[in-house]
């Protein structure tokens, strides 16, 4: 049995979980999320405990077992505490500023680059070179942060670009000059 999948999920106080057939809905103080569970996997709710089980040991069932348990646990974490990714901008003249709910970047291109926040995502600019992406859906927060990082990936020679906070960039040695 899956080591992750067999762990029960405890539902904290203030979180409402509904299981309607194959749809699991989680509602908390920050919002509501739902997930459709794949067909061989079953989810059972007992008071404040969610258990995820599988009917057999086929490869597909085994792989979906731990995944489903983790996705539901992430939904519960999202509606209680939420998720946040912090980004840093490194480079001369590289900066970000908030324009309403959008972000406008100066990244060394001939034009400013603007990014709008999708539903459920909020941006916070903590300075001209620091920003954070937050929301209740872990996958969506990570995807938006990755798309922002993709605007100007960190350069392996000088380290300039957009990086996650705490990310270590593997630096390359430049060519040996005479």
Curated annotation (Swiss-Prot):
Pfam families in the record: Ribosomal_L6
Disulfide links within the chain: none
Signal peptide coordinates: none
An individual GO BP term: cytoplasmic translation
A Gene Ontology cellular-component term: cytosolic large ribosomal subunit
UniProt xrefs under Gene3D superfamilies: Ribosomal protein L6, alpha-beta domain (3.90.930.12)
InterPro entries: Ribosomal_uL6-like (IPR000702), Ribosomal_uL6-like_a/b-dom_sf (IPR036789), Ribosomal_uL6_a/b-dom (IPR020040), Ribosomal_uL6_bac-type (IPR019906), Ribosomal_uL6_CS (IPR002358)
Keywords: Ribonucleoprotein, Ribosomal protein, RNA-binding, rRNA-binding
GO molecular function, one term: rRNA binding
Subunit structure of this chain's protein: Part of the 50S ribosomal subunit.
UniProt family annotation: Belongs to the universal ribosomal protein uL6 family.
Function statement: This protein binds to the 23S rRNA, and is important in its secondary structure. It is located near the subunit interface in the base of the L7/L12 stalk, and near the tRNA binding site of the peptidyltransferase center.
Name assigned to this protein: Large ribosomal subunit protein uL6
Organism per entry: Pseudarthrobacter chlorophenolicus (strain ATCC 700700 / DSM 12829 / CIP 107037 / JCM 12360 / KCTC 9906 / NCIMB 13794 / A6)
Origin organism lineage: Bacteria, Bacillati, Actinomycetota, Actinomycetes, Micrococcales
Gene encoding the protein: rplF
């Amino acid at each position: 049995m899956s080591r992750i999948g067999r762990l029960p999920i405890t539902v904290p106080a203030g979180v409402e979980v509904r299981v309607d057939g194959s749809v699991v809905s989680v509602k908390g103080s920050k919002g509501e999320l739902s997930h459709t569970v794949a067909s061989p996997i079953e989810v059972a709710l007992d008071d404040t405990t969610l258990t995820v089980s599988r009917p057999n040991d086929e490869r597909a069932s085994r792989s979906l077992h731990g995944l489903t348990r983790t996705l539901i646990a992430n939904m519960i974490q999202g509606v209680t505490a939420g998720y946040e990714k912090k980004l840093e901008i490194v480079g001369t003249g590289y900066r970000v500023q908030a324009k309403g709910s959008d972000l406008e970047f100066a990244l060394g291109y001939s034009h400013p680059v603007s990014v709008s926040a999708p539903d459920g995502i909020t941006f916070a600019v903590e300075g001209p070179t620091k920003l954070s992406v937050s929301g209740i859906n872990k996958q969506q927060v990570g995807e938006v942060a990755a798309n922002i990082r993709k605007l100007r990936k960190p350069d392996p020679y000088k380290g300039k670009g957009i990086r996650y906070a705490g990310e270590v960039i593997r630096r390359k040695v430049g060519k040996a000059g005479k």
